């Protein structure tokens, strides 16, 4: 067991890392990547963790306001405040992550390290573990006094959205989420902003698994194409999510339908459920983790 061979500063650093994350990472490679935050594996973990952190932050922020609140400015502003390099750099210090010994790490690199830690939790133990680390490091400390509404929106059921969710492999639990997506207006927009982040995370986790050699830059470029409004709108047509003929050619509007569907599934069944629906929408590998670290 690699832990038994640790001594001196490295043993202390690993102990600090465990305490900060609230868990032990089983993989030595993941631990080394977080202690010396540079190189191919670190970049790939940061890429995935960035996307997963966005889900955790946006989901929490959306729940702090009424579903009929028309403006998303609070959500947008608070998201930027929570995930900025400055904010995440402070998180690294306050949560007790060990110092970087190999080089003088910039604030940007320290912020990347928080995101990589979330990606490492996903690779090591799955998306639920990543959510827990994101909440422990960023969401709970950053939003300590904000209310969490959490209730299912009071919306009439909508079989169009429920059928689309089932077609994507999701077992609907609370129909109100899908009724809210169908209702349009602020409710749909709030679900869609979360759904957009989940779609991005589904693409990111799939890329990590499918292409072990791809760099962060290569994956980012590929993801932009997969996440285009035109590509997502095409799937909306296939899923029967274009309610009005006059909207059929409006890719932005049609893509919102799919994003709202994914957001509804995420609130209904959790992160893994949202990733599953997203993978079905995008036609990509469903990768809730854990995964081969070096994949």
Model-identified regions with their sequence ranges:
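Double-stranded RNA-binding/processing signature
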Residues: 1-295
């Amino acid at each position: 067991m690699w832990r038994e061979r640790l001594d001196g500063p490295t043993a202390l650093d690993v102990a600090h890392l465990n305490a900060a994350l609230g868990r032990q990472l089983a993989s030595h490679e993941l631990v080394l990547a977080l202690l010396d935050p540079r190189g191919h594996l670190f970049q790939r973990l940061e890429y995935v963790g960035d996307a997963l952190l966005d889900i955790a932050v946006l989901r929490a922020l959306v729940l702090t306001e009424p579903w009929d609140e028309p403006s998303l400015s609070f959500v947008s502003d608070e998201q930027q405040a929570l995930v900025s390099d400055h904010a995440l750099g402070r998180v690294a210090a306050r949560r007790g992550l060990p110092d970087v010994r190999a080089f003088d790490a910039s604030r940007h690199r320290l912020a990347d390290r928080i995101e990589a830690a979330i990606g490492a939790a996903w690779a090591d133990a799955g998306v639920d573990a990543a959510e827990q680390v994101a909440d422990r490091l960023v969401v709970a400390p950053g939003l300590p006094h904000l209310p969490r509404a959490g209730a299912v929106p009071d919306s009439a059921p909508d079989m169009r959205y429920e059928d689309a969710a089932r077609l994507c492999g999701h077992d609907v639990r609370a129909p109100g989420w899908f009724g809210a997506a169908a209702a349009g207006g602020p409710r749909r927009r709030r679900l869609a902003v979360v759904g957009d982040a989940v779609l991005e995370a589904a693409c990111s986790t799939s890329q990590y698994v499918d292409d072990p050699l791809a760099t962060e830059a290569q994956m980012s470029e590929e993801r932009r194409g997969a996440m285009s409004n035109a590509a997502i709108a095409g799937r909306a047509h296939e899923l029967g999510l274009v309610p009005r003929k006059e909207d059929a050619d409006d890719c932005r509007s049609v893509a919102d339908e799919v994003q709202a569907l994914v957001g509804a599934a995420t609130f209904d069944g959790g992160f893994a459920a949202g990733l599953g629906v997203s993978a079905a929408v995008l036609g990509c590998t469903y990768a809730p983790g854990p995964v081969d670290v070096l994949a």
